[in-house]
């Protein structure tokens, strides 16, 4: 203890080192939030904090919150309340709340949960260390940096995904202002991260053993328009492909209307880029798309999907839909069902509409009963289940490169992913083998069977990058 105090006294307030002080970090919400969490964790670890997975042991707890939909908001509030209990039941000295819920409800959090020592906005992660300093001195702080300017990317991140895939957040904020979405108000306008910053961060991740980069943002397709005056995602991708050690590069959150020829060509021609795109289309009824504030028509969506499949025949397309949006009639729902049946997306998720305060959609007339929303969601997912099963059956007999993620307990089998599957949201391939494999290995696997969303296979031959 004496050594710890003496060493800490050698540093100024903004450089204080916390030797052997435990921190528990809870990251809620999307993969973009996870990137923020890993950046904050990296800063804390560099200052001497030791990360623990036992919240009762922690002297500092940080909750990075989400409030995108009602359920996420409730989860975040409950998480803060649960962590606040450790002020009396554990070792907790400082409780820090950050993220989207903190940005949106800073006054309410401070008033209703007095155990919270600091509230940081979505653009204030750089202030975390100072906030911890103040909290450990018994001082309450609130930091809300304006939602503008080039996103600041701090030093080395702490990888929490297992070490072999990582998300690379290429932009912050959003300019779309869809009528159901609060993100522009809590994340600000669209701001690209400079290309050289992203390349340096990607190199650091590769040096730490990362083999798959997954590019994320509220919208990836317009990357660079604010910095370079033109869409530059294809240029960023080409630079990332040059990094040694990276085997796969995957792109999520591509708004369909912003996909452009150079991007398609780059995805098609660069060997490291997975032939996989995530296209959040939300609906197919022109009337509902207009009410949502989307910028595409159903025919444009059909044309975009057709172009992608023509130019990249083995491309895997994922999309997300919202059902039960205000004013959605049974005819609108049936039109969406027909569209899904026609398009046969490889991967598809469906959310029921969640009214968010301070959004235009929340005050629209003709709100849909929750039971109807859930029924429509179930119908869409039942249809997609049939499509997925048929597509899986077509994979039987083919060989795929697979990244191993782990071993099935008590069985001679491993779990992995093909290029067609993004982590956490898509399916897996279960590989039966007596060979010893490690997480992060790449193997060539032969598909012997299929399930509704997953594949079954065996080793064809090992692949080493």
Regions found by a protein language model. Give the residues of each.
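Cysteine-centered motifs
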Residues: 3-5
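Ala/Thr-enriched low-complexity intrinsically disordered regions
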Residues: 8, 12-14
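Proteins enriched for Cys/Gly/acidic motifs involved in redox and nucleic-acid/cofactor modification
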Residues: 16-223, 262, 277, 299-310, ...
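Short glycine-enriched, charge-decorated loop/helix-capping segments at active-site entrances
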Residues: 67-68, 187-188, 227-230, 290-296, ...
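Conserved SAM/AdoMet-binding glycine-rich loop
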Residues: 95-97, 104, 207-333, 341
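Conserved, mostly hydrophobic/aromatic
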Residues: 198, 215, 251, 279, ...
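Terminal RNA-binding accessory module
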Residues: 363-465
């Amino acid at each position: 203890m004496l050594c710890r105090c003496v060493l800490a006294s050698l540093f100024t307030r903004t450089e204080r080192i916390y030797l052997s002080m435990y921190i528990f970090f809870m990251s809620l919400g999307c993969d973009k939030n996870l990137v923020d969490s890993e950046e904050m964790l990296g800063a804390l670890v560099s200052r001497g904090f030791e990360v623990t997975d036992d919240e009762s042991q922690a002297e500092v707890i940080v909750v990075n919150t989400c409030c995108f939909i009602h359920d996420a908001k409730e989860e975040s509030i409950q998480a803060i309340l649960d962590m606040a209990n450790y002020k009396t039941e554990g070792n907790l000295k400082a409780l820090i709340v950050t993220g989207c819920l903190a940005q949106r409800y800073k006054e309410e959090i401070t008033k209703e949960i007095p155990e919270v020592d600091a509230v940081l906005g979505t653009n204030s992660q750089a202030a975390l260390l100072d906030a911890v300093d103040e909290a450990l001195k018994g001082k309450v702080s609130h930091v809300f940096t304006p939602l503008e300017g080039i996103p600041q990317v701090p030093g080395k991140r702490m990888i929490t995904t297992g070490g072999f895939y990582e998300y690379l957040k290429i932009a912050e904020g959003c300019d779309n202002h869809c009528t159901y979405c609060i993100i522009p108000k809590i994340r600000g306008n669209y701001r690209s991260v400079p290309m050289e910053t992203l390349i340096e961060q990607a190199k650091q991740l590769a040096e730490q053993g990362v083999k798959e980069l997954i590019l994320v943002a509220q919208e990836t397709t317009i990357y660079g328009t604010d910095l370079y005056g033109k869409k530059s995602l294809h240029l960023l991708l080409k630079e990332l492909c040059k990094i040694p050690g990276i085997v796969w590069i995957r792109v999520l959150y591509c708004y369909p209307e912003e996909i452009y020829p150079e991007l398609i060509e780059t995805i098609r021609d660069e060997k490291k880029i997975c032939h996989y795109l995530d296209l959040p289309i939300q609906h197919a009824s022109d009337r509902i798309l207009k009410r949502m504030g989307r910028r595409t028509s159903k025919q444009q969506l059909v044309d975009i999907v057709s172009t992608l499949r023509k130019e990249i025949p083995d491309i895997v397309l994922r999309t997300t839909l919202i059902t039960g949006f205000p004013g959605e009639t049974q005819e609108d729902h049936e039109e969406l069902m027909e569209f899904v049946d026609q398009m046969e997306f490889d991967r598809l998720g469906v959310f029921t509409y969640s009214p968010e305060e301070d959004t235009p959609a929340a005050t629209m007339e003709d709100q849909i009963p929750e039971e109807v929303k859930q029924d429509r969601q179930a119908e869409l997912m039942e249809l997609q289940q049939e499509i997925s099963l048929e597509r899986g059956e077509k994979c039987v007999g083919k060989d795929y490169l697979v990244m191993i993620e782990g071993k099935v307990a008590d069985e001679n089998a491993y779990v992995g992913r093909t290029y067609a599957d993004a982590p956490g949201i898509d399916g897996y391939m279960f590989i039966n083998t007596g060979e010893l494999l490690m997480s992060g290995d790449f193997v060539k696997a032969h598909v012997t069977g299929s399930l509704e969303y997953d594949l079954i296979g065996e080793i064809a031959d090992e692949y080493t990058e």
